[in-house]
A protein has these predicted regions:
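Conserved beta-strand -> loop -> alpha-helix junction used to position metal-binding or nucleic-acid-contacting
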Residues: 73-88, 337-359
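Short, polar/flexible loop-turn hinges at active-site or ligand-entry regions and domain interfaces
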Residues: 42-47, 67-76, 92-106, 126-132, ...
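Acidic, low-complexity intrinsically disordered tails
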Residues: 532-550
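Conserved helicase C-terminal RecA-like lobe
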Residues: 311, 325-333, 350-530
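P-loop NTPase Walker
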Residues: 1-98, 131, 155, 238-241, ...
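Helicase P-loop NTPase motor core
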Residues: 24-30, 34, 220-222, 229-337, ...
Length: 550
């Protein structure tokens, strides 16, 4: 640990807020803090509760704690807000007015209840309860209501979880915040970690003001800042800090590069004539990097000073809206470059996923690995949807099924033979949770889905006014909305380790018509000296690209 990480990890009890900028070792600091408390201060592991926002983050936390503490790490409760809420409801089902064997409603059940109830939420809940079901979105609000009405339960859980750790605290919403306030007294041992400049989820109800008022909510709260960045090169960090400066929520915002590399490349900036030109630029540059065939091959020396070639899995293309992915994906496909694409949408909303989940539930008696069963379900369903019958009016196509199989397979492998775990991850996870980090493919992600990930090479495409910041026709974004878009831009820039390219086009088809575009105003905040202008003298694409890549 570095000096400030050590200060954070070994802080005494009481409320603690850790402001951890991108790439500053947030998870490492959090796990070392928990390990320090258990190993050095004799805190019982069963008194610790660590809450994350995604299952992927929870798994990573659990895995690292096992590495630090060994078998006793199993006694620490690590989970998402949803899974903690579910635990509280399972343990107090009767008090909460639920049957002991209540289930989370699947998509079909939710859709049926919604169709019958219309917009009447009370009727919708009543229909679910009649079938012993709970909506996924109630997994936090129901425990909050339960604890509010039963002070003795509040005491019981405060006694059980005397030490609470919350990751990504800038993303909590009003209900999650209330749950934390119920579980942790104002002078309690609550450790919150995050970065308000990465608060990008207001559309989901997240409210960064809870992070900003931590010291008012909790008595004598300590504040520790982590500013040493282990991820990105100095030019990338300089650009990112300048980009966020106009609306930063962190006083004296800084990110100090731990990597000292005087030869680190500047941020590549490509002004494209069209969307096709932009996609060709991405393909051409990937070809140069992966083939290592030109002076532009990535020789920033990835720490050890040797020229290193890049593989497809080292590369990500990020964009503001999912619609921007198609031309990039098509251009990569034409060049035979493998791709995996993910968004921040819920897994269960992807066409085909619900059908596969239903098939697995019905075929519950079958054994075998989840991955094999997903593939089998895919074959059965693809055939069923290929022959139109009266009951296949769902609009799901065989292509949807195979796309869903591709997206779900990495997740299925991680679940081994545990179908129940797989189904619950489908219910609560986002598409990006099913990303396969080992896949030898270029990753295409929305900026929201990219949060928390890192790649040696990043392309941030579509840096135009109207896309970044996003503006829908006929609307004027508020100051707060523009500030959040700037934070999203900051998140995108700080995903890059060695190489960062930003691009913008002169003309783009948006909302059904071709429009003139101007570069994003966010680029203006970055010193021109940090950019390398590309494209003014870019070599034309060699004709033999396909052969070289094969």
């Amino acid at each position: 640990l570095d000096a400030m990480q050590r200060v954070a990890a070994s802080a005494p009890g009481g409320p603690l807020l850790i402001v951890a900028g991108p790439g500053t070792g947030k998870t490492r600091t959090l796990t070392h803090r928990i390990a320090y408390l258990c190993a050095e201060l004799n805190v019982y592991p069963e008194h610790c509760l660590a809450i994350t926002f995604t299952r992927r983050a929870a798994e990573e936390l659990q895995h690292r704690l096992e590495g630090l503490l060994g078998p006793v790490a199993e006694d620490i409760t690590v989970g998402t807000f949803h899974s903690v809420g579910l635990t509280i409801l399972r343990e107090n089902a009767k008090t909460a007015g639920l049957p002991a064997d209540f289930r989370i409603a699947d998509d079909t059940e939710r859709a049926a209840a919604r169709a019958e109830a219309g917009d009447d939420d009370a009727a919708y809940v009543k229909l679910l309860r009649a079938a012993d079901l709970v909506d996924l979105d109630e997994l936090v609000s129901l425990p909050v209501a339960l604890l509010r009405d039963h002070p003795e339960l509040v005491e019981r859980y405060r006694d059980r979880w005397r030490w609470i750790f919350v990751d990504e605290y800038q993303d909590v919403d009003a209900t999650q915040y209330e749950l934390l306030r119920l579980l942790s007294p104002p002078d309690g041992n609550l450790c919150a970690i995050g970065d308000p400049d990465q608060a990008i989820y207001s559309f989901r109800g997240a409210d960064v003001s809870y992070f900003l008022r931590f010291s008012q909510d909790f008595v004598d709260a300590r504040l520790v800042r982590l500013t040493r960045n282990y991820r990105s090169s100095a030019p990338i960090l300089a650009a990112a800090v300048q980009a966020i400066a106009p609306s930063t929520l962190v006083r004296d915002r800084r990110l100090d590069p731990a990597r000292l590399d005087p030869g680190a490349p500047l941020v590549g900036r490509y002004p494209a004539a069209s969307v096709t030109d932009e996609a060709d630029f991405v393909v051409r540059t990937i070809d140069e990097l992966v083939g290592g065939l030109s002076h532009r091959s990535l020789d920033s020396g990835r720490i050890d000073g040797h020229t290193s070639n890049v593989s497809f899995s080292d590369i990500a293309v990020l964009y503001r809206t999912d619609a921007q992915a198609a031309p990039i994906r098509d251009a990569l496909a034409r060049a035979n470059i493998p791709v995996q694409k993910r968004s921040h949408n819920r897994l269960r909303d992807l066409p085909g996923v619900a059908a596969i989940a239903r098939e697995l539930r019905h075929a519950d008696g079958l054994g075998g690995s989840v991955a094999a069963r997903v593939r089998l379900a895919g074959q059965v369903l693809a055939q069923r949807y290929a022959t139109p019958t009266l009951d296949t009016t769902s609009g799901v196509t065989p292509e949807d099924i195979w796309t869903a199989v591709d997206v779900l397979t990495p997740l299925a492998h991680r679940c081994g033979d545990d179908v129940a775990s797989f189904l619950s991850q489908i219910a609560t996870g986002a598409e990006v949770d099913a990303l396969d980090p080992r896949a030898e493919a270029v990753t295409l992600l929305t900026l929201h889905a990219a949060k928390g990930l890192e790649f040696p090479v990043v392309f941030l495409v579509g840096c135009e006014d109207g896309l970044l910041p996003l503006r829908l026709p006929g609307t004027t974004p508020t100051e707060a909305e523009i500030a959040e878009e700037r934070r999203l831009f900051f998140v995108g820039l700080t995903r890059a380790q060695d190489r960062l390219y930003v691009s913008h086009v002169r003309r783009r088809l948006r909302h059904g018509q071709e429009r003139e575009c101007v570069p994003s105003p966010f680029l203006d905040a970055i010193d021109a000296g940090l950019f390398e202008r590309l494209g003014d003298s870019a070599p034309r694409r060699p004709k033999d690209r396909q052969l070289r890549l094969l």
